[in-house]
A protein has these predicted regions:
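Bacterial extracytoplasmic/cell-wall-associated proteins, especially those involved in peptidoglycan
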Residues: 5-116
Length: 116
């Protein structure tokens, strides 16, 4: 049985960053965790906030087993504090690089720009 927080975070990692590097996937997880801490909300509450993560109200458990397993592993590592990362320097948001405001950019990882 997978804990709800791990499932929600894994869904975000999968749907927002599959195809990105492992660092990019950890960075997406960091943003979710940063928001959870800052807003004193659960991981699932953060994921399902209106207009925050594209299509999150329609996300389903993926059929791509390898990418899904990696998403579960990353979510588990992050939430169980097995792996501590700080790729985003405390970023609260990310966007596709082509749509991101240049003046707020903290770091670019793959196709995403992370900012506060």
């Amino acid at each position: 049985v997978i804990k709800a927080s791990i499932l929600c975070l894994a869904l975000a990692i999968y749907h927002e960053s599959r195809g990105e590097s492992e660092n990019g996937q950890y960075a997406v997880a960091e943003v979710v965790v940063n928001r959870s801490i800052e807003r004193n909300k659960t991981i699932c509450d953060v994921i399902y906030e209106p207009r925050q993560f594209s299509g999150s109200n329609k996300w389903k458990i993926p059929k791509d087993n390898n990418q899904w397993k990696q998403s579960i592993n990353i979510a588990t590592n992050v939430l169980d504090n097995e792996v501590k990362t700080n790729y985003t320097n405390g970023s609260m948001y990310f966007r596709v690089a082509s749509l991101s405001p240049k003046n707020k950019q903290i770091i670019r990882i793959g196709n995403h720009v992370f900012y506060k």
